């Protein structure tokens, strides 16, 4: 708690998306994102291997998350639908796939690998205030940081502006929740933000 208090007091942490730490890739041959490279090598650049999972999609769908079309590509009929563990992708006799694949946007050649982001910082600070670690517990402050963190995440993925406004308006007000309920909402947004970074999401 003392170390966290010191960090919060010193205010030397990143304060905008300009401080994001990323490993950069490019469209130059040999320097593409490895996730793109897997698809280019094995499936002709079309993602028929990696699909949306309900453990991320359902919490996003609950609040009409504006990142859905940035995270996932719709099925052949234009509908977003995810899979459960070990569930096969849904297709038809013509080979059209109806399950939502992880988006070509996330698997583009020059998609950077995020090491640490502004939205992570804000959501962690939100958790600090919700728990009262090194600071006075303050769910109103936690909610302010929560909203800012989710907004920053939507901005990072270039989600639609109007859809993001609607999404943010649907999120619960943490100040009206119990501590455990507030922490659940914060953790769920951390989980969603780390969807493309599974090691961090599980730590």
Segments predicted by a language model, with ranges:
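Hydrophobic-face positions in mid-chain alpha helices that act as interaction patches
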Residues: 4-125, 130-131, 137-193, 198-199
């Amino acid at each position: 708690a003392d170390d966290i208090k010191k960090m919060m007091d010193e205010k030397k942490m990143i304060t905008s998306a300009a401080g994001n730490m990323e490993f950069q890739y490019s469209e130059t041959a040999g320097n593409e994102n490895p996730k793109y490279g897997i698809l280019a090598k094995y499936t002709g650049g079309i993602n028929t291997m990696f699909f949306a999972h309900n453990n991320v999609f359902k919490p996003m769908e609950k609040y009409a998350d504006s990142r859905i079309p940035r995270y996932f590509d719709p099925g052949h009929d234009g509908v977003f639908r995810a899979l459960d563990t070990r569930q096969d992708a849904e297709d038809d006799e013509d080979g059209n796939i109806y399950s939502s694949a992880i988006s070509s946007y996330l698997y583009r050649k020059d998609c950077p690998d995020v090491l640490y982001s502004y939205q992570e910082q804000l959501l962690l600070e939100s958790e600090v205030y919700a728990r009262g670690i090194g600071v006075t517990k303050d769910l109103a402050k936690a909610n302010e940081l929560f909203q800012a963190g989710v907004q920053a995440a939507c901005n990072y993925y270039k989600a639609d502006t109007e859809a993001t406004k609607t999404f943010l308006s649907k999120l619960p007000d943490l100040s009206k929740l119990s501590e455990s309920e507030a922490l659940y909402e914060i953790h769920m947004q951390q989980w969603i933000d780390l969807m493309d970074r599974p090691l961090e999401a599980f730590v």
